[in-house]
């Protein structure tokens, strides 16, 4: 049964008291996390009312639904004649409120800090008068990428040309590099994947979902996590084995993400007899057998130029380096971003 929330001008005293209690609970946690994370620096976040959120999403109606992950759903909504992406976290008994509090406030505080970078989905505000805060982000016209590194337009998957895929890969790398280099404490995303990347009207990549992110102690290169968090197929095997998070945890995930964008295949595939195969093992096998043409998304083959084919080859080599077994053999994200910029420029320089 669909849950009903306080509607504009109609709530009972009990409902209003409940919303007020949520506001006080969520507000106190938010303030504590913000003060702890920002060292007194001001981060402006607009406060939206529950009436605005419910009106914008038609009480979270399926007609406004955009996409979802395990713990939340995205909705499209309009507030004051402006379109927004509205993120609503799950409230069911399986995920449980107390298990999700840290991740939710991680997402709010860190997203606010990233709002000055063009390759992060910009957090514009939130509403604290729900069991979990509802987050309001800038609108992304082309929505989120899917598990095949594509986007759905009018119910069908839209084929992204190679130049756009390379641009997206470069911009995701720029975003992760910013996390790793822009702050005194290195921030590790821990869940880099295409489904967390939104695309605006200009196909600019916007990385989102910082709920699993973790900061390394200042001056330290790793931290032991209580739980291994992330998405199957993208999780660094070293992190999975040891529970230690390093900047190379993100490098591995980005490498898988880049392979997905190149191939148009999901990170984990079902093959014969129901067995599973990862994109990494498939690409390694094809490259070892000299079958690069089978690595490239076959839908691109008829339009790809010889120069672009060289770009694809360079990107595949880079992605495989990101996924090396030993983290010391992987490049840092700043180097990955630099190489992708050079690969993108190579075609322009040769023409």
Curated annotation (Swiss-Prot):
Q: Which Gene3D superfamilies is this protein grouped with?
A: Phosphorylase Kinase, domain 1, Transferase(Phosphotransferase) domain 1
Q: A GO biological process this protein is involved in?
A: cell surface receptor signaling pathway
UniProt-annotated binding residues for ATP: 66-74, 87
Where does the Protein kinase domain start and stop, copy by copy? Answer: 60-347
Q: Outcome of mutating residue 211 to F, per the record? A: In strain: cv. Kas-1, cv. Kon and cv. Sorbo; confers sensitivity to the harmful biotrophic bacteria Xanthomonas campestris pv. campestris (Xcc)
Reactions catalysed, semicolon-separated, are: L-seryl-[protein] + ATP = O-phospho-L-seryl-[protein] + ADP + H(+); L-threonyl-[protein] + ATP = O-phospho-L-threonyl-[protein] + ADP + H(+)
Impact noted for substituting residue 233 to A: Reduced interaction with uridylylated PBL2 and reduced ability to mediate cell death
Xref: PROSITE patterns = PROTEIN_KINASE_DOM (PS50011)
Which InterPro entries does the record cross-reference, listed alphabetically? Answer: Kinase-like_dom_sf, Prot_kinase_dom, WAK-like
Tell me what the record says results from residue 31 to E.
Answer: Impaired interaction with RPP13L4/ZAR1 and reduced ability to mediate cell death
Task: Outline the inducing conditions.
Answer: Induced by elevated temperature (e.g. at 25 degrees Celsius).
Its EC number is 2.7.11.1
Task: Note the effect listed for residue 27 to A.
Answer: Impaired interaction with RPP13L4/ZAR1 and reduced ability to mediate cell death as well as an increased sensitivity to the pathogenic biotrophic bacteria Xanthomonas campestris pv. campestris (Xcc)
The annotated active site, in chain numbering, is 191
Query: Could you say what the effect of mutating residue 231 to Y is?
Result: Abolished interaction with uridylylated PBL2 and abolished ability to mediate cell death as well as an increased sensitivity to the pathogenic biotrophic bacteria Xanthomonas campestris pv. campestris (Xcc)
Q: Which UniProt keywords apply?
A: ATP-binding, Kinase, Nucleotide-binding, Plant defense, Transferase
What the record says about family reads: Belongs to the protein kinase superfamily. Ser/Thr protein kinase family. ZRK subfamily.
Per UniProt, subunit arrangement is: Component of a stable high-order oligomeric complex made of RKS1 and RPP13L4/ZAR1 which recruits Xanthomonas campestris effector XopAC/AvrAC-mediated uridylylated PBL2 in the presence of ATP to form a wheel-like pentameric resistosome; this complex triggers immunity toward X.campestris in vascular tissues. Interacts with RPP13L4/ZAR1 and uridylylated PBL2.
Q: What does this protein do?
A: Serine/threonine-protein kinase that confers a broad-spectrum quantitative disease resistance (QDR) to the pathogenic biotrophic bacteria Xanthomonas campestris (e.g. pv. campestris (Xcc), pv. raphani, pv. armoriaceae and pv. incanae) by restricting bacterial spread to the vascular system from the infection site; X.campestris causes black rot disease in crops. Seems to not have any kinase activity.
Name of this protein: Serine/threonine-protein kinase ZRK1
Which species expresses this protein natively? Arabidopsis thaliana
At the highest ranks, the source species' classification is: Eukaryota, Viridiplantae, Streptophyta, Embryophyta, Tracheophyta
